[in-house]
């Protein structure tokens, strides 16, 4: 009798735990996908149709590690709530995701292991890197795209960025926005985002007072944008992306003072 009661209580606890996690179904799908990828990692040599003359005796190296992310891409969700964003990121048909979502109240939702590839960057480019999804961590901030970011939300972001930078040795220059890597189609995080505050903590670069800066006569602003990292397929979009990030300005064109800022960067 006691044994049956114990089984019943265990089953009840398990049912209660699952039934009270609103994401239990999608969490199960997540774990199933991880198992499938784990099987691929254990496959030696890789099964393919190349017809390679593989050695009869497989020799596996003892020197290996997991690939680590080298960029952090910051987004705003452009949705009305964290709940709406989490729903979007758990629907297979949307094909979009992010490693982290930070809600307005500072709550952090870690949706995907840092070492796995999220679908957050899309078609993008930064410097010579064209597949940002494969080399970055995506962080979505709960924000409708027009409002300011809450203090508690930014505090959580700073704590997270500090952990990521230390864990993966991410270079200071590689903390950027979605609007930087895809300026023709994205504008996030919006111009209210506190990039200067992040730069003061070594999550990105900033500029000094440009009052006494003198531009060289041969200064090429397009070449400078390219050096910073922008894709110049659409120069107007690249300029707006640069101004949004460093000048909190979304207008086109560059005046003399703005060129000085670009020169410093």
Where are these regions (language model features)?
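Basic/polar, cationic surfaces and motifs that engage anionic cell-wall
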Residues: 18-32, 150-233, 237-265
């Amino acid at each position: 009798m006691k044994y049956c009661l114990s089984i019943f209580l265990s089953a009840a606890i398990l049912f209660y735990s699952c039934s009270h996690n609103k994401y239990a179904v999608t969490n199960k799908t997540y774990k199933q996908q991880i198992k499938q990828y784990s099987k691929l990692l254990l496959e030696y040599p890789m099964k393919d149709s190349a017809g390679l003359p593989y050695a009869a005796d497989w020799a596996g190296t003892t020197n290996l590690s997991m690939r680590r992310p080298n960029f952090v891409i910051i987004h705003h969700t452009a949705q009305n709530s964290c709940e709406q964003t989490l729903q979007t990121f758990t629907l297979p048909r949307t094909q979009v995701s992010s490693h982290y979502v930070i809600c307005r109240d500072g709550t952090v939702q870690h949706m995907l292991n840092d070492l796995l590839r999220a679908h957050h960057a899309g078609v993008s480019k930064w410097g010579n890197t064209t597949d940002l999804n494969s080399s970055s961590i995506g962080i979505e901030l709960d924000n409708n795209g027009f409002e300011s970011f809450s203090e508690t939300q930014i505090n959580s972001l700073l704590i997270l960025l500090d952990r990521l930078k230390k864990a993966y040795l991410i270079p200071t220059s590689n903390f950027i926005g979605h609007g930087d890597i895809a300026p023709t189609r994205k504008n996030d995080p919006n111009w209210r985002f506190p990039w200067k505050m992040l730069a003061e903590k070594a999550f990105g670069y900033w500029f000094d007072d440009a009052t006494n800066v003198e531009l060289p006569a041969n200064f090429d602003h397009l070449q400078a944008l390219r050096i910073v990292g922008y894709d110049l397929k659409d120069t107007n979009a690249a300029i707006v992306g640069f101004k949004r990030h460093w000048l909190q300005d979304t207008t086109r064109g560059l005046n003399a003072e703005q060129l000085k800022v670009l020169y410093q960067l």
